[in-house]
Regions:
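Short cytoplasmic-facing helical segments at TM-TM junctions of multi-pass membrane proteins
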Residues: 71-114, 137, 141
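Transmembrane alpha-helix signature in integral membrane proteins
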Residues: 1-15
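Short cytosolic juxtamembrane segments of multi-pass membrane proteins
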Residues: 176-187
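Hydrophobic alpha-helical transmembrane segments of polytopic membrane proteins
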Residues: 137-175
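Short helix-capping/hinge motifs at transmembrane helix termini and TM-loop junctions
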Residues: 16-21, 49-51, 63, 131-133, ...
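Transmembrane alpha-helices
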Residues: 58, 62, 94-128, 151-155, ...
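Hydrophobic/aromatic residues within the transmembrane alpha-helices of Major Facilitator Superfamily
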Residues: 2, 36, 49, 61-65, ...
């Protein structure tokens, strides 16, 4: 689900950035949708997909894609205009401009947006699992609640936090460190 949300978020973010009409009319809608808690998508997903994996997938995508789209648009906007002007002055095409100037310049902020999108996707997955009948940490949490087993509830919450820390340290921190090292920004 997260991979689909990333692709969708990048596409929407690029479209919003590239077309002023979308920037003016679609971005406010996306900002509004982004503020919805993921659990709000659960009733729609159950009505459309039933109590299925597709329902959870839908909640994960809706919970994170719009956050990623906004971060892509903002990351590109925050690239210093002088970089683009210099590249265009030297004869860069639009493709070369994005490939060699804009994307590398916005990469650190983009990674931060991916990290935020992942945290939204992770929360959405938990809310989807809590509301549907799938097997996973969310359902294990609900089972603990139903059995009034505080130890199970606490353990599941600790596992959820540990998975979040592991993803941050094992994926995003490694990616950020590589980018910073490649740019000579680390000791």
């Amino acid at each position: 689900g997260y991979a689909i949300a990333v692709l969708l978020g990048i596409l929407i973010g690029l479209l919003i950035h590239h077309f002023p009409y979308l920037q003016k009319n679609l971005k406010p809608v996306i900002l509004g949708i982004q503020t919805l808690p993921s659990v709000c998508w659960v009733p729609f997903s159950i009505l459309w997909f039933g109590l299925s994996t597709q329902a959870i997938l839908f909640v994960v995508i809706m919970g994170s894609a719009f956050s990623i789209a906004i971060s892509v648009d903002n990351a590109i906007k925050n690239v210093q205009p002088i970089y683009s002007k210099a590249a265009l002055t030297m004869g860069a095409s639009q493709r070369q401009l994005y490939q060699h100037v804009i994307f590398p310049a916005c990469l650190p902020e983009f990674i931060t947006g991916l990290k935020q999108g992942w945290s939204f996707a992770w929360r959405a997955l938990m809310s989807g699992e809590v509301m549907t009948t799938s097997i996973g940490l969310g359902q294990t949490l609900i089972t603990g609640r139903d059995l009034a087993d505080i130890n199970q509830v606490t353990l599941v919450m600790i596992v959820i936090v540990l998975v979040g820390i592991a993803i941050d340290k094992g994926v995003f921190s490694v990616l950020e460190a590589r980018i910073l090292k490649k740019r000579g920004l680390t000791a």
